[in-house]
Amino acid sequence: MSWEPDTLTKYCRPEMFEELAAARPKLKICLAHFGWPWCRETAMLMLKYTNVYTDTGALYFDNAKEFYTQMLTRDVPMTWIDRSLRHQVMFGSNNPRFEQIRMAHAIKELGFRESTLDLICGENAIEFLGGIPNRKA
């Protein structure tokens, strides 16, 4: 979702990127902010297209842990990320708008497996940017 005043929200829906993801399977696409508030739509696209990624730099209101608990355990069940989407989620903080340290601590406190945290907190970004591929089982 864009906070730009002249940007229509209808063009921010993750589903608007499906044709591109399907037509260009080698093009890596990052749907920013987990597609908030359409997080499940983002997850659906990530399940369907391995070239679709997202980041955790979503808007939160005062408390990063409470927001991530809602977004990454209820809106999108944590098991979906831990089991199926772990190679497509990258840490993001929207710095300087929000404090990345608080956001990183909140992500780490949710209860993801250590290997999933390693992917989210760095390895996936390296792979996304053309570094060493990490598509492990």
How does the language model describe each region?
Residues 33, 54, 94, 117, ...:
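Conserved, mostly hydrophobic/aromatic
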Residues 51, 63, 94-95, 124, ...:
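Detector for Asparagine
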Residues 1-90:
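Catalytic pocket-lining loop regions of alpha/beta-barrel enzymes
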Residues 85-88, 98-137:
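Mid-to-C-terminal alpha-helical segments outside catalytic/metal-binding sites
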